[in-house]
From Swiss-Prot:
It comes from the Viruses. This is Minor capsid protein p49. Induction: Expressed in the late phase of the viral replicative cycle. Belongs to the asfivirus p49 structural protein family. Residues 134-167 are annotated as: Disordered. Keywords: Late protein, Virion. Together with the penton and the other minor capsid proteins (M1249L, p17), forms a complicated network immediately below the outer capsid shell, stabilizing the whole capsid. Plays an essential role in the formation of infectious virus particles. Especially required for the formation of the capsid vertices. During virion assembly, associates with the membrane and probably mediates the docking of the penton complex to the inner membrane, where it recruits the capsomers to form the penton core. One of its GO terms (cellular component) is virion component. It comes from African swine fever virus (isolate Warthog/Namibia/Wart80/1980). The keyword Repressor does not apply.
Length: 438
């Protein structure tokens, strides 16, 4: 049912598989195991079967393919800790992005989160082996430069105009996992103690947020496992934590962009693509623009508790620097918009109750956040079973039935939406619309 709906809606995308999907080896495609797990009845994930002719995993051919999801966004539902590709109630049509606004040959797909943070990092990492990269050198110059270019920022085509020399942080801005560390040809040693923000010269902040603070911010959107969140609740990530890679903010920005539906500002085209240097560093202004876009999405779609925002020590000072890029954030914060739990109604309705607040850190059991353990659920596509999330985060309830002819605009409002309030002891206001001038 879900596959038929997606196929009809995105038939034109199926005929044009992106270069990224065709070039990436199957054994590095974590999401294939998710697909096989959901559509082959093997909850541990079946081994992908590569089909040379259809460029799709054979065992999952009747399930949703990654190319089906190119133009979907996933709701920021705080109660969903572990959403896979197959949960159709989490699929929503997302407004198409003009191709001249994206780095055309990079796929923007939302990763399927698991309970293991290492998997979160590994499956969003760009591998360093030469053969695993798209042939960017073969793209036309016009495609290489199809990047969102705000007029207020320095030219991205000429790194010399950037406020920070592009070579200064070259050793800090590669995507990698621990397995790839020995393979990197970097200048100098990468140390956990090196925060990009601390490396900047001058009396003013050039745009980077130290990765520890970005990690805190983006974890609010990701809702990472409690084993990592309990460290965040302690006002900081211990630098010796193996989950925290030196370039965690870059990797989290990449995965958060796909998770929130915020278009990621594509990286600059590589000068050294023959060595697999697919990604070059972001300029400082470019980095800040991406973070502000993500923050905008998080604030606009999440229930935010001010005491958690206050746990991020640098955020208050950084909102001022976001002002030229994202007036919404600056204005919202200045008017104390975040003093209460505020939920903005998204553009598209969803069956899932998106009004639930993020987990209350005070409600913990041995340092663990109150999450619904999806590993105890048996997912079956034969009886159209949709898990009911009954634990921890508010009183979120999902309908157990799903219309065959799904249309996001026809989904009835949940009781929380109708009442414009949250159930339980969490008070909030639901705003049905918001002026862009906020």
């Amino acid at each position: 049912m879900y596959h038929d709906y997606a196929s009809k809606l995105l038939a034109d995308y199926r005929s044009d598989p992106p270069l990224w999907e065709s070039d990436l080896p199957r054994h590095n495609r974590y999401s294939d195991n998710i697909l096989n797990s959901r559509y082959c009845g093997n909850k541990n994930g079946a081994a992908p079967v590569y089909n040379e002719y259809t460029n799709s995993p054979g065992k999952a051919e009747k399930g949703l393919q990654l190319s089906d999801l190119r133009n979907f966004s996933f709701m920021l539902n705080p109660q969903h800790k572990n959403i896979g590709y197959g949960d159709a109630q989490d699929l929503e049509p997302y407004s198409s992005i003009p191709k001249n606004k994206l780095f055309n040959h990079f796929k923007n797909y939302r990763p399927a989160f698991s309970t293991h943070t290492e998997n979160l990092i590994k499956r969003n990492v760009v591998r360093t082996e030469k053969k695993t990269f798209p042939q960017v050198s073969g793209l036309k110059d016009t495609q290489k430069n199809c990047l969102t270019q705000p007029s207020s920022l320095p030219s991205l085509k000429n790194p010399k105009n950037s406020s920070v020399p592009s070579t200064r942080f070259s050793e800090h801005t590669k995507f990698f996992s621990y397995e790839d560390l020995p393979k990197l040809r970097t200048k100098g040693t990468i140390k956990h103690e090196q925060h990009l923000g601390d490396q900047m010269p001058g009396q003013y902040y050039n745009g980077y947020i130290p990765h520890q603070d970005v990690y805190n911010i983006l974890c609010l959107a990701h809702k990472l496992p409690a084993s990592v969140e309990k460290e965040i609740a302690g006002r900081g990530i211990p630098l010796g934590n193996p989950h925290v890679k030196p370039n965690i903010e870059q990797e989290l920005i990449k995965s958060t962009s796909t998770y929130t539906g915020v278009p990621m500002l594509g990286p600059l085209p590589p000068k050294d693509s023959q060595h697999g240097r697919e990604y070059q560093e972001f300029s400082a202004n470019r980095h800040m623009l991406q973070v502000s876009n993500i923050l905008h999405s998080v604030f606009a779609n999440h229930s935010i508790k001010p005491q958690i925002l206050e746990d991020i020590p640098v955020l208050n000072a950084q909102l001022a620097s976001i002002k030229p890029v994202s007036p919404f954030l600056n204005k919202a914060y200045q008017t104390h918009y975040m003093e209460n739990i505020v939920t903005l109604v998204p553009r598209f309705k969803s069956i899932a109750n998106y009004s639930s607040p993020i987990p209350n850190y005070s409600k913990r059991n041995n340092g663990q956040a109150e999450y619904f353990d999806t590993s105890k659920q048996t997912i079956s596509r034969h009886n159209n079973y949709i898990p009911k999330y009954t634990g921890g985060i508010g009183d979120s309830r999902l309908d157990s039935t799903f219309p065959k002819d799904f249309n996001a605009s026809s989904v009835p409002l949940t009781s929380a939406e109708k009442d414009h309030s949250l159930r339980g002891d969490n008070s909030a206001c639901c705003i049905s619309s918001i002026s862009p001038s906020l």
